[in-house]
Amino acid sequence: MQDTYLLALAEYLSGPDAGRGEVRFPQSRGRRGKMILAEAIAAFAEMNCGYDCAAMHKIVTDNGVDAFLVRRIARSRSWNRVRYMQLLSLTGARPSLLPRIKRLEDSPDAYVSLFALIIRISSAPEQTIAAVREFSGAMSHRVLSEIMLRLWRGFIPVAYEPMICSDNENLKLLGIYIIRFFGIEEAQNILYAQLDSPNGAVHDAAMYTLAIMKSSMTRKCVVQSVAGMSFFQRRRFYKFLAAEGYSTRSLSALQSAETDSRLGGYMESLVNSYKKMLG
């Protein structure tokens, strides 16, 4: 049955009349049928990008998939609740149901909290900044990666500057991840400015994003920032730079400023070993 639903979804969402009229799935009236339809919609969303989100939302609401999943979330616990929330994060939900989901953002369960935020963002992309600002939890790599997936599929508008210019640390992190994800070279100066951030997560995200984008490591702000790291933080960062393909010449400023001779030699040996590996 799921294959039949997937074919119907593909035809409706990719045809010239996408989003027009109603698409009903008569066999989805019962609980089992609703679940199969929810899984089919989620599978379609995972496998495709750039489709008409409004048309998909119409299918979800016309067939009561979002209301069904919200009821299952309320009645379930543990992994079953997370499973239903993951499905809802891909199908989206109508605005009237979102307050019931928002309450779950404060859950002690990290997965429940994560998907509560993702559901809000997927259901109302224009409210992404507000949703992230209101999120009380920390923006872990898992949370940011899930948001990036939705962004890649075209669910979320890209506007990194208002995020990074915000005083909210979670928004700053999301803005930095957007720059990293899309490799926005003209935003490098914004990243350099974030090296002065007192927040360790923002500072580290900016530093590693600069490295991923092959930015210059000779700037004074970079050298000073690295000098302020602990021994183990510097060691880990040097290893990352070597893996990213930096040469000893491009890292000369960092090597000259390195106060620990062990790390200076370690950096050079790492770069040389990676060169040998690449032939």
Q: What spans do the regions from the language model cover?
A:
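Structural detector for internal amphipathic alpha-helices that build alpha-solenoid repeat scaffolds
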Residues: 43-44, 50-60, 82-93, 113-123, ...
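Structured extramembrane domains adjacent to transmembrane segments
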Residues: 71, 75-90, 96-100, 109-114
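Membrane-interacting alpha-helical segments
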Residues: 38-41, 79-81, 232-233, 261
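Short amphipathic alpha-helical segments that mediate assembly, nucleic-acid/protein binding
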Residues: 6, 34-37, 53, 219, ...
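Juxtamembrane/interfacial segments around transmembrane helices
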Residues: 18-26, 167-169, 257-260
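Amphipathic alpha-helical scaffolding segments comprising HEAT/armadillo-like alpha-solenoid repeats
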Residues: 53, 60-73, 94-105, 125-135, ...
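N-terminal topogenic membrane-targeting module
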Residues: 1-74
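Short inter-helical turns and helix N-cap capping residues of alpha-solenoid HEAT/ARM repeat scaffolds
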Residues: 76-77, 108-111, 136-141, 167-168, ...
